[in-house]
């Protein structure tokens, strides 16, 4: 009676060992994927934080029409003010077939036309300034701490999103929200700090204050 041969050779690798090896490789791949995906999420969070720095306010939404060959084409126009309340503000206009699309385009347009506003320690403006756009004329002047924003309409929105806390503004001429907002932007863009004014005039700061 012969006994069966139970001797194993090096080529007879157990199937279970191969399965464990494949599982380890799959876990490593999944781990690497999680790390890569984690980096993507961190990048998305940074982008969201940058976007959260900006505030958006809709000044006006109007339904407008354009006469074409087939008749009138209706759309929406949105006037949007964008600012970070730290000295940067912009006014944008967007047109689209729906309100959401018009506002989105207005925000993008406002970020393309940002103006840097010099602010004082008391969150006011350094000097008196005047801006004109079309038939609208806007006069803004600095105010003492605790005064607040004395302005109305779209001018107030522009000043608040620029981060100005104490200011006086007067609207002269046209009452159109878009022209008034753009006139306020012209006035803010023409502002200069005392140091810049002294350098342009070629005099010292002491002469500016005297």
Swiss-Prot record:
Residues 54-117 form the S5 DRBM domain. Residues 32-56 have a biased composition (Basic and acidic residues). PANTHER family: MITOCHONDRIAL RIBOSOMAL PROTEIN S5. Residues 1-11 have a biased composition (Polar residues). The N-terminal domain interacts with the head of the 30S subunit; the C-terminal domain interacts with the body and contacts protein S4. The interaction surface between S4 and S5 is involved in control of translational fidelity. It comes from the Bacteria. Keywords: Ribonucleoprotein, Ribosomal protein, RNA-binding, rRNA-binding. Pfam families: Ribosomal_S5, Ribosomal_S5_C. One of its GO terms (cellular component) is small ribosomal subunit. This is Small ribosomal subunit protein uS5. GO terms for biological process: translation. GO terms for molecular function: rRNA binding; structural constituent of ribosome. SUPFAM superfamilies: dsRNA-binding domain-like, Ribosomal protein S5 domain 2-like. Residues 1-56 are annotated as: Disordered. The gene is rpsE. Belongs to the universal ribosomal protein uS5 family. Part of the 30S ribosomal subunit. Contacts proteins S4 and S8. With S4 and S12 plays an important role in translational accuracy. The keyword Signal does not apply. Residues 18-29 have a biased composition (Low complexity). It comes from Prochlorococcus marinus (strain MIT 9303). InterPro entries: Ribosomal_Su5_D2-typ_SF (IPR020568), Ribosomal_uS5 (IPR000851), Ribosomal_uS5_bac-type (IPR005712), Ribosomal_uS5_C (IPR005324), Ribosomal_uS5_N (IPR013810), Ribosomal_uS5_N_CS (IPR018192), Ribsml_uS5_D2-typ_fold_subgr (IPR014721).
């Amino acid at each position: 009676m012969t006994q069966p041969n139970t001797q194993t050779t090096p080529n007879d690798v157990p199937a279970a060992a191969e399965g464990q090896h494949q599982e380890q490789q799959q876990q490593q791949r999944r781990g690497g994927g999680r790390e890569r995906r984690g980096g993507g999420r961190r990048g998305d969070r940074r982008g969201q934080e940058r976007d959260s720095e900006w505030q958006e306010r809709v000044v006006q939404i109007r339904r407008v029409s354009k006469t074409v060959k087939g008749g009138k084409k209706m759309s929406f126009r949105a006037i949007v003010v964008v600012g970070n309340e730290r000295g940067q503000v912009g006014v944008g206009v967007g047109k689209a077939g729906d309100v959401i699309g018009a506002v989105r385009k207005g925000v993008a347009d406002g970020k393309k036309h940002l103006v840097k506003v010099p602010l004082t320690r008391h969150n006011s403006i350094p000097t008196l300034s005047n801006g004109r756009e079309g038939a609208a004329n806007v006069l803004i002047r600095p105010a003492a701490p605790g005064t607040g924003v004395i302005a109305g309409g779209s001018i107030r929105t522009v000043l608040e999103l620029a981060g100005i806390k104490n200011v006086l503004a007067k609207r002269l001429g046209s009452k159109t929200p878009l022209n008034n907002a753009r006139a306020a932007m012209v006035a803010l863009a023409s502002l200069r700090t005392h140091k810049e004014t002294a350098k342009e005039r070629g005099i010292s700061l002491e002469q500016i204050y005297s």
